[in-house]
């Protein structure tokens, strides 16, 4: 069951700020490795805490992709993309 990958406006802006090779790596990873899985939770790690408790993260090198997995609509909504040192701040 293929999943649809969607990006929020802020995630799209963050993707544009990355250099081209890193942005392509993130897009390829999400489409080719995560989107094709029957259960995308098997490749990620769930986040904890009051603000990010329902989100999942995926590692792409030093970058982190924060997602909301919506089972009812079979959609993986990418919330945030950033360096591992900065992506969790402010959430």
Regions found by a protein language model. Name each.
Residues 17-20, 35:
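Residues in soluble alpha-helical coiled-coils and helical-bundle/repeat scaffolds
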Residues 1-4, 9, 13-17, 24, ...:
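Enriched for short, Lys/Arg-rich terminal
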Residues 11, 22-23, 38, 43:
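A sequence-composition feature that detects small, non-aromatic residues
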Residues 20-23, 52:
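Intrinsic disorder/low-complexity segments in short proteins, especially the signal peptide
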């Amino acid at each position: 069951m293929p999943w649809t990958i969607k990006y929020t406006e802020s995630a799209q802006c963050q993707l544009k700020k990355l250099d081209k090779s890193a942005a392509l790596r993130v897009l390829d990873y999400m489409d080719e490795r995560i989107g094709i899985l029957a259960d995308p939770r098997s490749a990620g790690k769930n986040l904890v805490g009051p603000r990010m408790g329902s989100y999942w993260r995926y590692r792409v090198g030093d970058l982190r992709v924060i997602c909301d997995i919506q089972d009812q609509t079979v959609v993986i909504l990418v919330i945030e993309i950033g360096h591992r040192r900065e992506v969790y701040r402010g959430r």
